[in-house]
Swiss-Prot record:
Annotated protein name in UniProt: Arginine--tRNA ligase
Gene3D superfamilies reported for this sequence: Arginyl tRNA synthetase N-terminal domain (3.30.1360.70), HUPs (3.40.50.620), Isoleucyl-tRNA Synthetase, Domain 1 (1.10.730.10)
Reaction catalysis annotation: tRNA(Arg) + L-arginine + ATP = L-arginyl-tRNA(Arg) + AMP + diphosphate
Family matches, as PANTHER family: ARGININE--TRNA LIGASE, CYTOPLASMIC (PTHR11956:SF5), ARGINYL-TRNA SYNTHETASE (PTHR11956)
GO biological process: arginyl-tRNA aminoacylation
EC number from the UniProt entry: 6.1.1.19
Taxonomic lineage of the native organism: Bacteria, Pseudomonadati, Pseudomonadota, Gammaproteobacteria, Lysobacterales
Species whose genome carries this gene: Xylella fastidiosa (strain Temecula1 / ATCC 700964)
Gene label: argS
Motif ('HIGH' region): 129-139
Cell compartments where the protein resides: Cytoplasm
């Protein structure tokens, strides 16, 4: 709905350039076309006249009047007003919203999608949990946000590659192996010989039990079988890491999250990519040695201080494999890369960007893009839930799914802006009431399904063609408000993608559901008059389609009965 208004404005500017009112070198400024907060100021408003006045030295209000007079006529525009210092407010004719409602049903599942990404490749990395324990609620938020971002990017025409980076190397993995080995030897937390920095959750005992039993793990490309040898740390390492990878994959599948690529940090060392990346940085001239360590001149690229890459003992600091990993993304042809991380990783971003810039191979500044999410607080009965017996110290994603549902968990973890702290209220997520936002939205969808079922049961045949042709019969304000709300969906899909803020989809769906429930309570639908009934059912079906499309972007289901 916004694009035709913008196109009219551009045509008006061109007309003023052609007749000499505006200089021929006047380019259309980067003006805003937006929906005002209240409809009394129109359906759309623009600041274009004020921007043009700055470039030309004209009075903005007079220029607005001149521009309005130069606009082509449009059947969609009911009237145009000039407000304040030079805002131009457009009031649309209801026929524009009626036509958009018809477009919903014609485009079906494709409604709201666009081709702005031009099939370019974007890699979206998310979750990327260490395989040292069950996925916690923070990983769940990362999974929900990352998966929704991937869906949004696809809806905006991008070729998306979903990627999970396993940090299967380093000190935490060594602690995991020692923990499982100790359990396999009969030790338990609190024993004198229990390892320092060991993992204490019950899942460690489960891994040790499976290892001692000689169990096998079915991975995607191989079957891993325990050797049962408690002294073979390499075998325990291989078994424990893959056991937890398998457990994490199970939880992600239950959460309707999948990936195209699983990338192992260990492969960067195995394939020599870490050494190769370090050598490239040395060759670029952006490193130096001091105190027996190798340093990156990261201050040359915006970091607040230079960073140690290779310590005096020959080991690498943790951000070096991160540079090698992101270099691999660039080499795989990702024109755009988005990495979703917890906010606690904020300190590493500048050094990774610095390392990639120091390679001097054409990687643009700001590549990759980062989306950071804040912590999640889980509440039950008005009190914070802090512990899980299985994990030994945190609430797991599996806990939330089992206590609520996949749909509720996904919704609640997406519902706030990623960089905002989030409270997950288990009691609210389980409610079947309008206070529960996911229930409220799904209930709107189910209500339309119920309407269609009732019409069938009463032998009230629905003629969609007649309904599309008769939408002008719905002249009441609640029907128009619902059509207006429906028409916002494509804009929201585009804006949410541009800002990388999937919570905007959830917010919009609540507003659409509210508009529908209001319409439903104020408008008898299954009336005797067939023409009116078909028009109302058409509006209901268009609402259902947009709800379905939006819920699909969130990875949330569309139940036909509630």
């Amino acid at each position: 709905m916004k694009a035709p208004v913008r196109a009219l404005i551009c045509q008006g500017i061109e007309a003023l350039r052609s007749n000499g009112t505006l200089p021929t070198n006047t380019l259309p400024p980067d003006f805003v076309v937006e929906r005002p907060k209240t409809r009394k100021h129109g359906d759309f408003a623009t600041n274009v006249a004020m921007l043009l006045s700055k470039a030309t030295g004209s009075n903005p209000r007079l220029l607005a009047q001149t521009l309005v007079a130069a606009l082509p006529t449009s059947a969609d525009i009911a009237r145009i007003e000039i407000a304040g210092p030079g805002f131009i407010n457009f009031h649309l004719h209801p026929v524009a919203y009626q036509r958009e409602t018809i477009n919903v049903l014609k485009q079906d599942n494709d409604y709201g999608r666009n081709l702005s990404g031009q099939s370019r490749t974007v890699g979206v990395e998310y979750v990327s949990a260490n395989p040292t324990g069950p996925l916690h609620v923070g990983h769940g938020r990362a999974a929900a946000i990352g998966d929704c971002l991937a869906r949004l990017l696809e809806a905006n025409g991008w070729n998306v590659k979903r990627e999970f980076y396993y940090n299967d190397a380093g000190v935490q993995i060594e602690n995991l192996v020692r923990s499982v080995q100790a359990r396999a030897r009969g030790l338990k937390p609190g024993d004198a010989l229990w390892p320092t920095d060991a993992y204490n959750g019950e899942y460690i005992a489960d891994i040790a039990k499976a290892y001692l039993a000689g169990d096998s793990i079915n991975m995607v490309d191989t079957i891993i079988t325990s050797t049962k040898n408690v002294d073979d740390t390499a075998a325990i390492h291989h078994f424990a890491v893959n056991y937890l990878r398998n457990e994490q994959n199970h939880d992600l599948a239950a959460f309707n999250v999948d990936f195209d690529i699983y990338f192992l940090e260990s492969s960067l060392y195995k394939d020599g990519k870490v050494e190769e990346t370090v050598q490239k940085l040395i060759n670029s001239g952006h490193t130096y040695e001091e105190g027996g360590a190798l340093w990156l001149k990261s201050t040359h690229f915006g970091d607040d201080k230079d960073r140690v890459m290779r310590k005096s003992d020959g080991s690498y600091t943790y951000f070096v494999p991160d540079i090698a990993y992101h270099l691999s993304k660039w080499q795989r042809g990702y024109e755009r890369a988005i990495t979703e991380l917890g906010a606690d990783h904020h300190g590493s971003l500048a050094r990774v960007h610095a390392g990639l810039q120091a390679l001097e191979i054409g990687i643009p500044p700001g590549w990759p893009e980062y989306v950071l999410h804040q912590m999640v607080t889980v509440m039950r009965g008005g009190e914070e839930v802090k512990l899980s017996k299985r994990s030994g110290g945190y609430v797991t994603l599996r806990d939330l799914i089992e206590e609520t549902s996949t749909d509720a968990t996904r919704w609640f973890l997406i519902a706030r802006k990623p960089d905002s702290q989030l409270t997950f209220d288990i009691d609210l997520a389980r409610q079947k009431s309008n206070d529960n936002p996911v229930f409220y939205v799904q209930y709107a969808y189910a209500r339309v399904c119920s309407l269609m079922h009732q019409a069938h049961e009463k032998n009230l045949n629905y003629d969609q063609t007649s309904g599309m042709a008769s939408l002008d019969q719905l002249s009441d304000n609640t029907s128009l408000c619902l059509m207006i709300e429906i028409s916002r969906y494509p804009e929201i899909v585009q804006i949410a993608c541009e800002l990388l803020e999937p919570h905007l989809i959830a917010q919009y769906l609540r507003e659409l559901a509210h508009a529908f429930h209001t319409w439903y309570h104020n408008t008898p639908v299954l009336v005797e008059n067939a023409v009116e009934r078909n028009a109302k059912l058409t509006l209901a079906c268009a609402t259902r389609q947009v709800l379905a499309n939006g819920l699909n972007l969130l990875g949330v289901g569309t139940p036909e009965k509630m």
